[in-house]
């Protein structure tokens, strides 16, 4: 749990944005998670400005959640819609009760069915934080035929991800703990 908490505090806001090939990043994750059955077909995508390591961590967390709480195969895709890059991670598990989805993006919150699986309750909070740093949006919902779908929507035509004053680690710890005690 301590490692997850430290990971939550290191949200990537200090990482420099760089040109990122999303297809390459996704293919690296497919390889990293072998032998997990991940279905991914690269599409023609532009390079985007992103914090590459943080983006990889974000998508890796979603794949890991699919592995732990969902069922194979995991479907991974990226496509352009209007001026947005949409990255989707979907599994074929049971999904999550709709009334729990929003709460799961808060630190230390776990779903009812996840209580039998070891975890910290920080995975989706880390995902949400990294999406916010990239000026993106995160949509999580149950798929029409079961399973859970997470869609990350990132702007394509931005100079670079959101620049905010980087809080110190102590500030982050205070902010995170204050809301939970």
Describe these PLM feature segments.
Residues 73-83:
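Short beta-strand/loop element within the Bergerat-fold HATPase_c
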Residues 39-47:
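Conserved catalytic submotifs in the C-terminal HATPase_c
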Residues 72, 135-136:
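Conserved glycine-rich
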Residues 91:
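Acidic ATP/Mg2+-coordinating residue in the GHKL
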Residues 123, 127:
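Short alpha-helical Gxxx[C/S/T] motif in the catalytic ATP-binding
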Residues 11-15, 47-50:
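Conserved micro-motifs of the catalytic ATP-binding
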């Amino acid at each position: 749990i301590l490692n997850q908490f430290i990971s939550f505090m290191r949200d990537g806001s200090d990482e420099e944005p760089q040109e990122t090939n999303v297809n390459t990043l996704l293919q690296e994750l497919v390889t990293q998670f072998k032998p997990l059955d991940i279905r991914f077909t690269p599409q023609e995508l532009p390079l985007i400005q992103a914090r590459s390591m943080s983006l990889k961590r974000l998508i890796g967390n979603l794949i890991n959640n699919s592995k732990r709480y969902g069922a194979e195969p995991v479907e991974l895709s990226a496509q352009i819609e209007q001026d947005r890059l949409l990255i989707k991670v979907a599994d074929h598990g049971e999904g999550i009760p709709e009334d729990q989805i929003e709460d799961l993006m808060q630190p230390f919150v776990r779903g009812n069915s996840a209580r039998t699986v070891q975890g910290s309750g920080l995975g989706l909070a880390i995902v949400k934080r990294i999406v916010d740093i990239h000026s993106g949006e995160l949509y999580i919902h149950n798929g029409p035929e079961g399973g859970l779908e997470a869609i990350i929507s990132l702007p394509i035509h931005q100079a670079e991800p959101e620049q905010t004053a980087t809080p110190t680690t102590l500030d982050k710890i205070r902010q995170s703990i204050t809301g939970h005690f």
